[in-house]
Amino acid sequence: MEIQWYPGHMAKAKRLLQSQLSKVDLVIELCDARLPLSSRNPALNELVRHKRRILLLCKADLAENGKTQEWLAYFKSRGVDAMAYDATPARTKQGKAFIATAAQSVVERGERRGMNKTVRAMVIGVPNVGKSTFINRLYGGSVTETGDRPGVTKSNRWVKVTPYLEVLDTPGMLWPKLNDQRAATRLAYIGTIRDAVYNQEELCVSLLEDLMTLRPTETMQRYKIKNADAKGYELLEEVCRGRGFLMRGGVLDMDRACSVVLDEFRAGKVGKLTLETAPKEEKPHAPETV
């Protein structure tokens, strides 16, 4: 199964994003804490590399705390200012302070000129990483449309979230060619890629195999899997029988099983799980930001 997804609105959004860069003081990049490396768009990274940037590891409540700390240390070693974030009030307060610190130099520059500078920040990231939810939390209400699916935001939009901070909500963007298919599969696990793009049964089988490697006890208990040695489609059949996903005549309801497994994983019901391990840095790396 090969996964590729780069619809026309993403290419258009990238061009619009480029046209807005000159107006931006700060870039706020969001990635998924469960996939801190694979959920960062290398094309966007190149596009904004000359801008002051901070990184938020979103949905941190769904990731393993210890591994999130390892990722934060890794990004720090690369000169990236990063913090773990989720949509709770406490984290939102920390996020506001984090942005304020990053924007301080812009504010001070305006004060030296006798101006009350409004900081303009661009929010970027892959689809369904939580950009619109993040902006709504900053604003303190529903100012942008959200949804638990990729592709909700289709155009760039400036939103004034405080008297001194204006943010640009941008559509989630992938890159034209997903060469690393292992990463593409994991992006599909977390809902970055539209469901219609891939074979749901193949994706679910792959996820179940990963869960049996990473969380065998929890996975077997949740889905009532009796055969610990089951592989491939045998796992999906075990889920159907264990959870009672049967149609008339005892036919296994594979579609329902796939939907449930994917939905429950994305909601964190199998437990906190980080799908990537932070690389070990042997020597200091050149900073990503300027």
Q: What name fits each language-model region?
A:
Residues 121-140, 144, 170:
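Glycine-rich phosphate-binding P-loop
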Residues 106-114, 136, 142-148, 214-219:
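Short, structured loop/turn "capping" segments at alpha-beta junctions
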Residues 44-46, 72, 139:
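Short, solvent-exposed amphipathic alpha-helical segments in soluble enzyme
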Residues 52-54, 61-125, 143, 245:
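Canonical P-loop GTPase G-domain recognition
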Residues 1-27, 33-53, 60, 66, ...:
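Helix-rich effector regions associated with P-loop NTPase G domains
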